[in-house]
Curated annotation (Swiss-Prot):
It is an enzyme of class 6 (ligase). This is Methionine--tRNA ligase. It is found in: Cytoplasm. A motif ('HIGH' region) lies at residues 12-22. Binds 1 zinc ion per subunit.
Length: 729
């Protein structure tokens, strides 16, 4: 039996911000790595950013920077997002490190020495407009296999690997012009020559391990159709140089160098890296990828390893998944649809809630649509109504009626036989990387605990049979300890919090399951989560639905935003008096405001990532004064401040300053067209209604349908100086 688990998640491209769908792989690998450590298995979890290639070079041109600077910028963005999601890499590296260059070139030279490379001239698309050879993914056209739109390396619809010249009606993705064909010379990996070794390895691997059905199907179909020589060099500047004469101005194809990144990144932290990567007898290599990456991990990367004739650790378990999509739309920063990693951080919703929902719906066998309403329902009913409820009700009841001490009793309640079978089932799901099933089994155990508590009615028996009632509750407390261990791969912050309830008296280890070990006192208890409120979910749904969708909704409902604002919205200037951080959510500021009234107002806002407290105290800001009161993490909020956000997601609170007459706290903000009207104080409204007014910043001025917003008394225009153009919300 193999003793070690070497776990990788597909290296994310560094030239973008990851969205929820991109996070599936790193989160899945994180859960499996945490399970592996829980079982006492020596574990290494490796990931990093994929930084070379045309996509990076082109993005750098767009952002008017160098590829190196672009990679540095996005590496930090990726790293910060993964840290917020509490992903516990053993290393999160980069393919631009020195060891990567050495490793890629060394493997190439071994392939060449062993006769697994060829050289030949080929026809490649060249864009006359942009004066450059076009990378595969910078040519689009019709897939010759299924007829769908595809890029020049692979069709995402049917997963067929392509060459750009295979496409029907090809176009340059940059300028949309039709490219011409020019002759160029490249090095190819001779896959047909490796086919017998690859097929033999595939047969052994399929017999000894479990691959996702879709992965086996796609790989076998690819082998059945026949392997072809595949270019591993290209005409680019940004990449690993080819160590061969006549190829000084070419680099390695990113698909060739990227998988090797798993090895080179491991070298960065371990001098003993060969004990992981050249130890096939004792090491399980478990790789987490999306379905669009299957062939690169089942054919290309294994072929490189086999062709080198070295004893590389080969793929044991391929955990491929389908796509996580968004509200029947595509994730798109430019269109404003979908929620991305940096957006998630600003919602005020804890990372464990996001982790829970992604695992609960992990797209293991089919694509899944992220839906806000389902997000709220699953979190409130399963995570909070089921799991959190069991922890809270049992510990609170025990502490209230039986004190802090946890007696060491014999585990003998009748329910343990059923529970232990469920433990075995859960651990087997983990082992097979059926993460969604593992989580749902854990939730089923929690439901069983709730049912036992409800059926036994300890509130009725605590006085008549106190010892028996106490023993029942103690058994349930040991069940809660076990649940905190089993669920730790999915929601680690919450697991740690439950452990703190017990004074961190036990470890996240399977050796405690079903035992009476590791508990002595309940030091404190508190609610694990606050329910998600409908108004918050509706506001997030609207915010990330894209401007076009918002306009479509507005048109379909025949809403006039000017009339809506005049008749139903009340914006006011307020002065920030004090700011505190929410003790249960550090990202949330609690702002005490002077609104001209004797009592003032209080609002809660997710500003901690954007401002320090002292930057806002004393400033005049704008709030939606007539919003229905709401609670955020248990704190009452009596309004919402407004801010501007541009297309790059830069965010600034609108500060009302630099007027001839200082703004008066409580002064209303109105449309310029209403400056001579007598306006009534409108009734309380939902946040959805406010968003339908569609306030925008245009050339530094706040407007609705071209009409300026102004201060009611001084008639001064409301300005957005720091972000002159963008959405206001």
């Amino acid at each position: 039996m193999k003793k070690k688990n070497l776990i990788t998640a597909a290296l994310p491209y560094v030239n973008n911000i990851p969205h929820l769908g991109n996070l599936v792989q790193v989160l899945s690998a994180d859960a499996f790595a945490r399970y592996s450590r829980m079982m006492g298995i020596e574990t290494l979890y490796v990931c990093g950013t994929d930084e070379y290639g045309t996509a990076t070079e082109t993005k750098a041109l767009i952002e008017k920077t160098t590829p190196e600077e672009l990679c540095n910028k996005y590496y930090e963005i990726h790293k910060s997002i993964y840290e917020w999601f509490n992903i516990k890499f053993d290393i999160f590296g980069r393919t631009t490190n020195k060891r990567h260059k050495e490793t890629v070139q060394d493997l190439f030279l071994k392939l060449e020495k062993n006769g697994y490379t060829t050289e030949k001239e080929s026809e490649q698309f060249f864009c006359k407009q942009d004066q450059m050879f076009l990378a595969d993914r910078y040519v689009t056209g019709e897939c010759p296999n299924c007829g769908n739109n595809a890029k020049g390396d692979q069709c995402e619809n049917c997963s067929k690997l392509l060459s750009p010249t295979d496409l029907i009606n090809p176009k340059c993705i940059i300028c949309k012009n039709i490219p011409i064909i020019k002759t160029t010379k490249h090095i190819y990996i001779d896959l047909p020559k490796i086919k017998d070794e690859l097929s033999h390895w595939m047969q052994i691997t399929e017999l000894n391990t479990n691959w996702n059905t879709n992965a086996i199907k796609i790989t076998n179909a690819f082998l059945r159709d026949g392997l072809k020589e595949r270019a591993i060099t290209r005409d680019l500047k940004w990449g690993i140089p080819v160590p061969k004469k006549e190829y000084e101005n070419k680099v390695f194809y990113v698909w060739f160098d990227a998988p090797i990144g798993y090895i080179s990144i491991t070298k960065e932290i371990s001098k003993d890296w060969e004990s992981w990567w050249k130890n096939n007898e004792e090491t399980n290599l478990v790789q987490f990828i999306g379905k669009d990456n299957i062939l690169f991990h089942t054919v290309i990367f294994p072929s490189i390893a086999l062709g080198s004739k070295e004893n590389w650790t080969m793929l044991s378990k391929l955990a491929s998944s389908e796509y996580l999509n968004y509200e029947n739309l595509k994730f798109s920063k430019s269109a404003g649809t979908g929620i991305f990693g940096n957006d998630v951080i600003t919602t005020g919703i804890p990372s464990d809630i996001w982790r829970f929902y992604i695992y609960y719906n992990r797209p293991e066998k089919s694509d899944f649509q992220f839906m806000w309403d389902d997000f709220m329902e699953r979190v409130n009913s399963e995570l909070i109504g089921n799991f959190s409820n069991l922890v809270n009700r049992v510990l609170t009841f025990y502490k209230k009626f039986f004190g802090d001490q946890i007696d060491k009793i014999e585990i003998k309640e009748d329910f343990w036989q059923e529970i232990n079978l469920k433990y075995d089932k859960t651990l087997n799901f983990f082992k097979q990387v059926e993460l969604k099933s593992a989580l749902k089994e854990i939730l089923d155990i929690s439901r069983t605990g709730n049912k036992i508590f409800q059926d036994k009615e300890p509130w009725k028996t605590k006085d008549s049979t106190p010892q028996k009632t106490k023993e029942l509750l103690l058994n349930l407390i040991y069940l809660i300890r076990d649940l905190s261990i089993l669920i730790s791969p999915f929601i680690p912050h919450t697991s740690d919090k439950i452990r703190r309830f017990f004074g961190n008296s036990y470890e996240i280890s399977n050796r405690f399951l079903g035992t009476n070990l590791g508990l002595s006192t309940i030091q404190f208890t508190e609610v694990l989560f606050i329910k998600l409120e409908k108004h918050l979910i509706n506001s997030l749904k609207l915010k990330y639905s894209g401007s076009k969708n918002m306009q479509d909704e507005q048109t379909s409902n025949q809403i006039n935003p000017i009339n809506l604002f005049s008749e139903q919205v009340c914006l006011k200037v307020v002065q920030v008096k004090t700011i505190e951080r929410n003790p249960d959510a550090e990202k949330l500021f609690i702002l005490k405001l002077n609104d001209g009234s004797s009592d003032g107002k209080q609002i809660v806002s997710s500003l901690a990532d954007y401002y320090k407290e002292e930057e806002l105290i004393g400033k005049h800001i704008i709030i939606v004064d007539n919003l229905k009161p709401a609670k955020f993490r248990g704190i009452k909020s009596e309004g919402m401040l407004i801010a501007t956000e541009d297309k790059d997601k830069n965010f600034k609170v609108i500060i009302v300053e630099d007027f001839k007459d200082n703004p008066i706290p409580g002064e209303r903000i109105i449309l310029e067209s209403d400056s001579y009207k007598e306006l009534k104080s409108p009734a309380k409204i939902s946040i959805d209604k406010f968003f339908k007014t569609q306030i925008v910043a245009e050339n530094g001025e706040l407007k609705i349908n071209g009409i300026n917003l102004i201060l009611e008394h001084s008639k001064e225009k409301i300005l957005s100086i720091e972000i002159p153009n963008g959405k206001v919300y």
